[in-house]
Regions:
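C-terminus-biased signal that marks the final domain/tail of proteins
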Residues: 2-225
Length: 225
C-alpha cells in the first residue's frame, strides 16, 4: 500500500530495476540545471524536489496514520527521517477498510483536535465534579471558529490535517474485480463533500448514463432538486 498526500514520496531511483522504476534519462541533469541538486551524493527524489509542507521529511500525519493502521508491526514512529514508499499490510485491505481510512480524523490519538475541547461539569447527585468532552466538539471547524475558540481558551484547538476534511469536493474508492464481467467488475464508490459524513454511491464501469443530478456541479451553487 502506498500513500502520497501532497508530498513527494519517491526516494532513490534504481533504473536497473525496470520492474519497479521508470524515470527520464535526464532527471538528475534537470534538477542540476534548475538549482535543485548540486550533483553530489545520492539523488533522493523527495529531498531534491523540496516540499515545504513536508517539513523536511517524505511524510506527515496522513501518511503516518495510514501506514500505522495498516502495518503496525513495522513500528514506524512519527519523527523518523523518512518512511518507506509503500508497506505490506498486516492483513488484507478491502474497500470497507479504505473507506474507513478516508473517514479518519485521528480520533483517540495525540492529534485528535477535540482532545482539549472539554467543559467543566459541576458535582451533582453525588457525582464528583469532572471534565467531559464538549457537546460542540467536532473536527470540522472553520478557520474563523478555530481562531475564536483559541482566543477564548488558548491552545484548545491544535489544527491537524486529517484524512477527512469538511472542504473536500469529492472522493472515490476504485474497486476492480477480475472474476466478474467487465461491465460490473469495476466500480467507483463515489462520495461528494466530506468523506466522513457522506454516503458512497456505486458507479459501475459499464454505466453509460447517470441520474440528472450528476450533471450539475454543486460546489458553488445549491440545487434543491
Amino acid at each position: 500500500v502506498g500513500i502520497s498526500a501532497n508530498i513527494p514520496r519517491i526516494g532513490r531511483i534504481d533504473r536497473a530495476d525496470t520492474v519497479n522504476f521508470m524515470a527520464s534519462d535526464n532527471l538528475e541533469q534537470v534538477a542540476i540545471d534548475n538549482g535543485l541538486w548540486d550533483g553530489k551524493g545520492d539523488f533522493v527524489f523527495w529531498k531534491v524536489i523540496v516540499c515545504s509542507y513536508a517539513q523536511g521529511r517524505n511524510y506527515r500525519e496522513r501518511e503516518f496514520r495510514v501506514f500505522d493502521l495498516l502495518a503496525p508491526s513495522l513500528g514506524l514512529k512519527y519523527g523518523m527521517e523518512d518512511f518507506p514508499f509503500s508497506v505490506k499490510p498486516g492483513s488484507l485491505v478491502d474497500v470497507r477498510k479504505v473507506m474507513a481510512l478516508l473517514r479518519d480524523t485521528y480520533e483517540g490519538t495525540e492529534w485528535d483536535m477535540c482532545k482539549n475541547w472539554t467543559i467543566d461539569v459541576p458535582e451533582k447527585n453525588g457525582v464528583p465534579a469532572h471534565k467531559e468532552m464538549s457537546p460542540l466538539a467536532n473536527p470540522w471547524l472553520t478557520t474563523p471558529m478555530r481562531n475564536t475558540l483559541n482566543s477564548i481558551a488558548p491552545g484548545v484547538i491544535d489544527f491537524k490535517r486529517t484524512l477527512a476534511v469538511a472542504w473536500c469536493s469529492y472522493s472515490t474508492v476504485i474497486q476492480s474485480r477480475s472474476w466478474l464481467p467487465d461491465g460490473i467488475g469495476g466500480v467507483c464508490w463515489y462520495a461528494v463533500d466530506n468523506p466522513a459524513q457522506s454516503p458512497r454511491i456505486p458507479i459501475f464501469c459499464g454505466s453509460t448514463k447517470l441520474p440528472a443530478a450528476f450533471e450539475k456541479c454543486g460546489q458553488k451553487e445549491y440545487y434543491p432538486n
